[in-house]
Design a protein with these regions (language model features):
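Intrinsically disordered, low-complexity terminal regions
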Residues: 1-246
Length: 246
């Protein structure tokens, strides 16, 4: 019995030492990693993709309209083994291993592709599009404290954002569909659209630039400002929400 107890204590002490050496803390929600050392760069091979799904604290720098030639990761050395980057059915997934989180800082990922059709983001992640994004349609699904900054020329852009997401758009499209709830901040005042459809609630603050029409509804204390010259508008407001031309 004493041998078993001693062996168990040795095992527990060993686990604690390993966790301490790797700076990994365990709790009921999983494992938290603290970055150690200066950031290094790692290059990984990936397959072709036209959709991105990103979770956790990643800063994605996406180059539009270039061939996919792998991706690079900039992070502390002790984080690399916990970073998952994989492509399945045309979707690039970027995340941490299950039940892991980072104590402080973001991981930078640089990647590009010829086309991009959809992006799904959750957590404290960001997407910065370098260059002009062109194509038929882009779907953006955002939640948590995610943020997007892009310039594009598209036929249609569909955005579904919740939480405390931030959105900055430049360029143009024919049809813009915006569904915003929570404390969303969206600046599309330099993103010229023909037709815009909105559903905005909570404390969301949205700026658009519609040249033909705006349709939709606002509730809560949300606000919508139109920097365009649209004249065929059908916007229903309730609560303390507001819609106005600038």
């Amino acid at each position: 019995m004493r041998k078993k107890i001693f062996a168990g204590l040795v095992g527990l002490i060993g686990t604690a030492l390993i966790a301490g050496a790797c700076n990994v803390k365990f709790d009921s929600k999983g494992k938290t990693i603290t970055p150690e050392g200066d950031a290094i760069t790692e290059t990984r091979d990936i397959g072709t993709f036209d959709r991105i799904d990103v979770e956790d604290a990643f800063a994605i720098h996406y180059k539009a309209g270039i061939p996919t030639d792998g991706l690079t990761i900039e992070a502390a050395p002790n984080l690399m083994e916990y970073i998952v980057t994989e492509v399945a059915n045309g979707e690039l997934s970027i995340r941490l291993k299950d039940r892991y989180s980072i104590h402080d800082g973001k991981i930078v990922v640089r990647v590009g592709s010829p086309t991009l059709k959809a992006v799904e983001m959750s957590g404290a992640c960001s997407l910065n599009v370098e260059g002009e994004l062109a194509g038929d349609r882009l779907d953006l699904d955002m939640s948590g404290a995610s943020s997007v900054n892009l310039t594009g020329r598209l036929r249609a852009l569909d955005i579904d954002a919740s939480g405390a997401s931030g959105i900055t758009l430049k360029g143009s499209c024919e049809e813009l569909t915006l569904s915003c709830s929570g404390a969303i901040g969206c600046d599309a005042s330099e993103f010229i659209t023909q037709r815009t459809e909105v559903s905005i609630s909570g404390t969301a603050s949205v700026k658009i630039n519609a040249s033909e029409s705006v349709r939709g509804n606002l509730s809560g204390i949300s606000s919508l400002e139109n920097y365009g010259a649209s004249s065929n508008d059908e916007v229903v407001t309730s609560g303390m929400s507001s819609y106005k031309h600038k």
